[in-house]
């Protein structure tokens, strides 16, 4: 049976391929712009060197270094912006796929299985409340009938999954799909950063 992790991993591989192509294309473009700018500055330096004295040459060299430094800073900023945009696009695409997943029959089985496993790990189930989003509340309220476990009529603003909490607010187990997305965010960020190295 294909798990959500398998789907996320497959999706990540597909996205990484697309991201890699996009990165390489944009890096080539940035390198060409930097190369053209550097060549232009070098021509200016040679022209001034031939016409002016040594002091003028020092001033031009200083200006050139400042421009190169400025370009490098701009390039770094563009790369940071590109990485951030790629991470956000990937996460948005992942979120859309997860929303589609919540509409499938696999999702119902996933929640039942995941919830059973989560509840097994909780020793004292007295006063436990399970929260779902509005759509899932309708699906699971009748299905989940556990001793000492209450399904709240109050819905949470989550894509899918559930949140378990006790009545005294002493503990909370967040098994919402947003948490899965947040966990993927760091991995996606690391993978995209590695593409630029």
Swiss-Prot record:
The lineage of its organism: Bacteria, Bacillati, Bacillota, Clostridia, Eubacteriales. One of its GO terms (molecular function) is proton-transporting ATPase activity, rotational mechanism. The keyword Transport applies. InterPro entries: ATPase_E_C (IPR038495), ATPase_V1_Esu (IPR002842). It holds the Pfam family vATP-synt_E. Gene3D superfamilies: ATP synthase, E subunit, C-terminal. Belongs to the V-ATPase E subunit family. It comes from the Bacteria. GO terms for biological process: proton motive force-driven plasma membrane ATP synthesis. Produces ATP from ADP in the presence of a proton gradient across the membrane. GO terms for cellular component: proton-transporting two-sector ATPase complex, catalytic domain. The gene is atpE2. It comes from Clostridium tetani (strain Massachusetts / E88). Keywords: ATP synthesis, Hydrogen ion transport, Ion transport, Transport. This is V-type ATP synthase subunit E 2.
